Amino acid sequence: MSAAFDPSAYDAQLQAKVTRLRELLAPFGAPQPAVFDSPREHYRLRAEFRLWREDGQRHYAMFAPGEKHKAILIDDFPIASERINALMPRLKAAWQASDELSNRLFQVEFLTTLAGDAMVTMCYHRPLDDAWEVAARQLAEELGVSLIGRSKGKRLVIGRDYAVEKLDVAGRVFSYRQPEGAFTQPNGAVNQKMLSWAYDAIGERDDDLLELYCGNGNFTLPLATRVRQVLATEISKTSVNAALSNLSENAVDNVRLVRLSAEELTQALNEVRPFRRLEGIDLKSYAFGTVFVDPPRAGMDPDTCELTRRFERILYISCNPETLAQNISQLQDTHRIERCALFDQFPYTHHMESGVLLVRR
C-alpha cells in the first residue's frame, strides 16, 4: 500500500507510523521510540523503470500492483534523487536519437549516491554488439556516469560496476562500494541516521560483535570501530566481495567475514559440525557481548532467534515491525527492550524501518 506523493501530508503519515510501532512494542514495555524522519522529496537514491511504447516512442513507465498491462507514464519522479531526475530526460533524449541505444531496450535502472556518484543500467531483449558499445561509451561520457548494458547472459560495463557512497558516522566518513544489482539502502539520508543510531546504541565495548546478514558492510564498518573484534556472516557472494572491498578501503582490520547462513553458524557455534569456510577462525577466541541482526522482511526464523538469545545484547534493525514484534515475543522472557527507534526509509508508504536494543534481564 502506498499513499500519493504529498509532502504536506508527510507529518501526519509519519505520526501514524510512530503510533503503529508503539502499539506493536507496547506489550514488551518498550520506551518511547526515537523518530528519524526523511527528506520530503528527492530521498530515493535508486529507481527502476520499465519502458512503454506509445506514439512510436519509448517512455519511462511504472505499473500499479496487479495491473501489468496498464502503464503509468513517468516524466519526472520527485521521490527520486535530484541526480536521477536530471539524468532521466537526458537519457531518454539519447535513446530517442539513437537506434543502437533504443533497439529492444525494455528497462532502465538508476543508482545514485549522496556522494554524487551515478550508475545507469540499460536492459535489452537482444545481444549487445560493438556498435552499441560505441554509442554507450559516448553516452556515459556525456552523462558523467558508469553505464552497464545487460542482455540475456551478458553484461557490458563502461566505467565501474559499482557506485561509491560516503557516509558520515560520528565524525568519521566511511566509503562504500555499492555493486550493480546488489541490495543497498534506498534512502541515503535516513540510512546515515540509522547508522548513527546503531553506533550510539552499541556504545564503546571491550568485547566482540557477531553480525548476521552483513550485506556490503553497511553497518559493519562503523560498528567495528566500537568493539574489539567482529565476526560477520553473509551468504551472497556479491555482497561478500563488496564488504571485503569496503573493509579494505576503510582500513577496518578487526573484522572476519565468512559465507555462512545463520543455521550453519549455529551449528558451528554448537560444534555440531566443522566448516571449511571457518578454517583459520577460532570461534572460542571470541568474547561475544552483542549480536547484530538486520534480517529480511520475514524476520528471524525461530532457530536464529534462539541463537541470538545466548547473547547479552541484541541489536536488531528491522524492515518489518510485525515480524520484529514476533521475534521479540520469542525473546521477551530473557531480554527486555532498552531503546528503540523508527527510521522513515519509505515515506508515503506504510513500510517502516525500526531498531531495538535488547538486553538480558
UniProtKB/Swiss-Prot annotation:
Note the superkingdom of the native organism. Answer: Bacteria
Among PROSITE patterns, the record links this protein to: SAM_MT_RNA_M5U, TRMA_1, TRMA_2
- Does the record carry Transit peptide as a key word? no
User: GO molecular function terms here?
Assistant: rRNA binding; tRNA (uracil(54)-C5)-methyltransferase activity, S-adenosyl methionine-dependent; tRNA binding
**Which UniProt keywords are present, listed alphabetically?**
Methyltransferase, S-adenosyl-L-methionine, Transferase, tRNA processing
| Methyltransferase among keywords | yes
Q: Which SUPFAM superfamilies match?
A: S-adenosyl-L-methionine-dependent methyltransferases
Q: In which residues is S-adenosyl-L-methionine bound?
A: Q185, Y213, N218, E234, D294
* Annotated catalysed reactions: uridine(54) in tRNA + S-adenosyl-L-methionine = 5-methyluridine(54) in tRNA + S-adenosyl-L-homocysteine + H(+); uridine(341) in tmRNA + S-adenosyl-L-methionine = 5-methyluridine(341) in tmRNA + S-adenosyl-L-homocysteine + H(+)
Q: Which BP terms from GO are recorded?
A: tRNA methylation
User: What top-level class of enzyme does the UniProt entry assign?
Assistant: transferase
Q: What CDD domains does the annotation carry?
A: AdoMet_MTases
Q: Can you supply one Gene Ontology CC term for this chain's record?
A: cytosol
InterPro entries referenced in this protein's UniProt entry, alphabetically: MeTrfase_TrmA_AS, MeTrfase_TrmA_CS, SAM-dependent_MTases_sf, TrmA_MeTrfase, U5_MeTrfase_fam
Annotated active site: C319, E353
Q: Which HAMAP family match?
A: RNA_methyltr_TrmA
- Function, as annotated: Dual-specificity methyltransferase that catalyzes the formation of 5-methyluridine at position 54 (m5U54) in all tRNAs, and that of position 341 (m5U341) in tmRNA (transfer-mRNA).
Give the family this protein belongs to, as stated in its UniProt record: Belongs to the class I-like SAM-binding methyltransferase superfamily. RNA M5U methyltransferase family. TrmA subfamily.
Q: What is this protein's name?
A: tRNA/tmRNA (uracil-C(5))-methyltransferase
**Which species expresses this protein natively?**
Pseudomonas putida (strain W619)
Q: Which gene encodes it?
A: trmA
